[in-house]
Amino acid sequence: MAKIPVTVLSGYLGSGKTTLLNHILQNREGRRIAVIVNDMSEVNIDKDLVADGGGLSRTDEKLVELSNGCICCILRDDLLKEVERLVKKGGIDQIVIESTGISEPVPVAQTFSYIDDELGIDLTAICRLDTMVTVVDANRFVHDINSEDLLMDRDQSVDETDERSIADLLIDQVEFCDVLIINKIDLISEEELAKLEKVLSALQPTAKIIKTTNSEVDLKEVLNTQRFDFEKASESAGWIKELESGGHASHTPETEEYGISSFVYKRRLPFHAKRFNDWLESMPNNVVRSKGIVWLAQYNHVACLLSQAGSSCNIHPVTYWVASMSEAQQTQILAERQDVAAEWDPEYGDRHTQFVIIGTELDEEKLTKELDACLVNAQEIDADWQQFEDPYQWQIRPAR
């Protein structure tokens, strides 16, 4: 039996996902499409479209609403069961999943990439994730990416523990897709559209970009495209490409024309946490995205992850430096990891800072000087770094 292709529609609230879903159903040309809807509010797609022809009647329950919330770990069991039920029932050529506007696409993709032994469900045997589509509102994206709002500020959070920012969510949705639809282009000027397209291309350089109004696209671009590859999608974000190239990723002349650029900041000295935190809090608003590994003097034994999207910025410890581990552990890891061994410094080991900065009209020289001023200087290098002012106050045990 041929595996059923699955298309996932992602995008922030109001971007046009539901309009796209209606467009797909209105123009399906004989395709038998099962729809899984996951939304915080009432299902608002035109159910008559599902009932109209192709055996997609409401009595067949081909239109499914999952429980309130976002498609995430909690609801993955529901999604697994529903997809399996639809495929085994038969009579469909394609599944389209409309994610809620506040969900990240990665958990959905993960659902189709592993076997759930507990439930006894193996979706990889009966269907394949075919296309990850993200819809962007051309008129709102720049405003929302620069907003300091959290989802809860707009009454859009899953629950009271959901502290995600709008900017982080938008970046997550853009960075993990293989088709990126810029919708509502009639609401902005040609120059604004050209610049937005280049910003999105910098954030997600491998996705197919489609510009449209009213989410009207050729269905061949979103159904049965065979575009999706989990490994490639996981490595397709612009910041990853830039880091992998060491800051020498190819930048098109058109991108540079609109002032979109990126560079990698890499140093073998630690940041003074207070000075670096001050810089993060006053980061220029033309920095759209920055992400990578940071070495902080006050936390000499751990590597920290910096992730900034628009006005949202987060830094936290993620792993121990190999250099902070026991000699036996170091020897074993260096023998197994050629990438770590190749970058090993006689004094600092694997400790380093390396992150990418993507933005508009970036002054690389000025930003680099500002960041260099945050590094531990010559007068501080031999001091007790633990005595430096610490804005984070993380409680982390030393590596063993």
Give the predicted meaning of each segment.
Residues 2, 42, 141, 150-353, ...:
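C-terminal accessory "lid"/substrate-recognition subdomains
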Residues 2-168:
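Nucleotide-state-sensitive switch-loop elements of NTP-binding domains
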Residues 22-23, 81-85, 110, 194, ...:
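Solvent-exposed alpha-helical segments within well-ordered globular domains of core cellular machineries
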Residues 47, 76, 106-109, 190-194, ...:
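Conserved strand-to-helix beginnings and helix N-cap segments that scaffold or border functional pockets
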Residues 48-53, 197-200, 369-372:
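Short, aromatic/basic amphipathic alpha-helical patches
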Residues 354-359:
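A short beta-strand structural signal in non-transmembrane regions
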